[in-house]
UniProtKB/Swiss-Prot annotation:
Protein name, UniProt field: ADP-dependent (S)-NAD(P)H-hydrate dehydratase
Entry-linked PANTHER family: ATP-DEPENDENT (S)-NAD(P)H-HYDRATE DEHYDRATASE (PTHR12592:SF0), ATP-DEPENDENT (S)-NAD(P)H-HYDRATE DEHYDRATASE FAMILY MEMBER (PTHR12592)
Native organism: Streptococcus pneumoniae (strain ATCC BAA-255 / R6)
GO molecular function, one term: ADP-dependent NAD(P)H-hydrate dehydratase activity
GO BP: metabolite repair; nicotinamide nucleotide metabolic process
Amino acid sequence: MKVINQTLLEKVIIERSRSSHKGDYGRLLLLGGTYPYGGAIIMAALAAVKNGAGLVTVGTDRENIPALHSHLPEAMAFALQDKQLLKEQLEKAEVVLLGPGLGDNAFGEDLVKQVFAGLKQNQILIVDGGALTILARTSLSFPSSQLILTPHQKEWEKLSGITIEKQKEDTTASALTSFPKGTILVEKGPATRVWQAGQSDYYQLQVGGPYQATGGMGDTLAGMIAGFVGQFRQASLYERVAVATHLHSAIAQELSQENYVVLPTEISRYLPKIMKIICQQERVSKDKLV
């Protein structure tokens, strides 16, 4: 088991070059938020923008776009029902987040199939929420892209066949051998673990708690992961995912000192400040971020 420490945080979250531009920080495509789950993709997009993603485009229900833009005018948006525009956006994206607030229905399944078929090896796909449920119940072939899965315990049960009470280190390690080599798994739970298929070791969070048990927490984490994946390329993909996952719970833990429950959107709002502290290599107290 590996622990995420201050050294790793500072390796991943670095100061930006003065000569950089938005194209250096990731072209993200976020897909989801179908009725009645529109808020999920909004929270994911908020997290991605707040952690510094260069360009964020959201595909969602047309009726959800005004709500998205009222919260986040920085994001571009289009209707998921526009198949041609979806195809064009998939071709442009470097990172695709599929599934926050995606309904488990025929439309959702068609979307998952189109995304899986359309991605290339040099793209990164994060599968979350409803897309995980669809993946678990269908016999779809894995896409050629780099794959990141973010299941909670019940979703992991559906994907792996391992019941919640048997989800241990050895069973997860064994189940990962069925996924493409290099697949990153964020196994969410009371002690979240981050794995990469082909490696025997894993990261385990030492932060977080029951104050995170509220709707939208996973959507925000997925957006944070997407944002980190699109930038910080001096670190490995595995390290970027691990640090994003850690920071999500670490911020929640800090906010819980004054709040009975921590709202996902509050984590996103606090994110730029904490990232600034880390990239300036200012030491932070161990009980807050590490």
